[in-house]
């Protein structure tokens, strides 16, 4: 090679490789950088960025701040909100604190939530995930079965979380999973059975590892595992599991343990006992869950027990009107888009709440009741431009009739139409 050619040979100013040894060499003022060094720089910057994100996670909301935000979405359940705020704060504080070099090991604090249908269990879990800006997944325990039987494997729960995190495994490993209807996987009797209970005790056994913390292999497309399939590896150590259930009948086990009776001489009046179910649930102990049919190892992995109250009429009316996602506010907004005002009379709201209590559906049943009342008027309004206001009255709820309609540009005396 001539001296002139040697001078013309261009090299990367960072690694010293010549232009023949790399795919691309980019020139700057008297300097050159190759594609390999660009990739390396990108990796270094990405690592630093991720470290900064980790540091930002330390600034998670304090328990009081978490509870204040929950107040905007969930009515009542003050003790439950406080207990959840503390448990969630401690969980993420544990994740963000390096305790590997310490003598003290902070253990995982998964949560068990007990409360009647429609008392706000799912909403609380969803709102917590929203506050903390972490991936969130809901699973139904009734669809799960032990591996090898018809139904869903427990690993499919983790796949839902991975999908919620857009397949960002690192993000998913700090998410929240809510397992609903956990009381439905209680074993059929307190004594271990010889016959296999694939949808009860078998599911509890299968959940143990992921609740405690393990590196699980998840099929990327869901479904059953098979040997020729590649798996996604996910560490569940820092995933917060919240298990919820109605646990119907567990109050009788608590009554039996505490010595309170609702039969025979000295018995409480039945209505008083019903009202006191919430009070009984607050006295729950792990031994009551064992008698209900949960296995000791499973109960041990859910150390935080949170109980929710049965929602009364006043709470249901507040749920209809107060939270940011209140049904009345939602319907007002929907009609407002069509240029129509909506009003719900106080008596109507009271009757809607009473219906939800009768159906024993709690807050969850409110939407179905209101949707039924509003269906016909919501069908008519977009096709008409003469409606100014719609009023949902007591008669609307009692007789399932159309709400009162007030027309535009007509004298008030002549403008009220009440459909029979």
Swiss-Prot record:
Protein name: ATP-dependent Clp protease ATP-binding subunit ClpX
InterPro entries per UniProt: AAA+_ATPase, ATP-dep_Clp_protease_ClpX, ATPase_AAA_core, Clp_ATPase_C, Clp_protease_ATP-bd_su_ClpX, ClpX_bact, P-loop_NTPase, Znf_CppX_C4
Binding positions for Zn(2+) per the UniProt entry: 12, 15, 34, 37
Role played: ATP-dependent specificity component of the Clp protease. It directs the protease to specific substrates. Can perform chaperone functions in the absence of ClpP.
Signal sequence residues: none
Highest taxon of source: Bacteria
Assigned protein family: Belongs to the ClpX chaperone family.
SUPFAM superfamilies recorded: Glucocorticoid receptor-like (DNA-binding domain) (SSF57716), P-loop containing nucleoside triphosphate hydrolases (SSF52540)
GO BP of this protein: cell division; proteolysis involved in protein catabolic process
UniProt key word Metal-binding: yes
Quaternary structure note: Component of the ClpX-ClpP complex. Forms a hexameric ring that, in the presence of ATP, binds to fourteen ClpP subunits assembled into a disk-like structure with a central cavity, resembling the structure of eukaryotic proteasomes.
Binding site for ATP: 116-123
Taxonomy of the source species: Bacteria, Bacillati, Bacillota, Clostridia, Peptostreptococcales
Gene Ontology MF terms: ATP binding; ATP hydrolysis activity; ATP-dependent protein folding chaperone; protein dimerization activity; unfolded protein binding; zinc ion binding
One Pfam family it belongs to: ClpB_D2-small
Classification via NCBIfam families: clpX, PRK05342.1
Species: Alkaliphilus metalliredigens (strain QYMF)
One GO cellular component term: HslUV protease complex
ClpX-type ZB domain span: 1-53
Keywords annotated in UniProt: ATP-binding, Chaperone, Metal-binding, Nucleotide-binding, Zinc
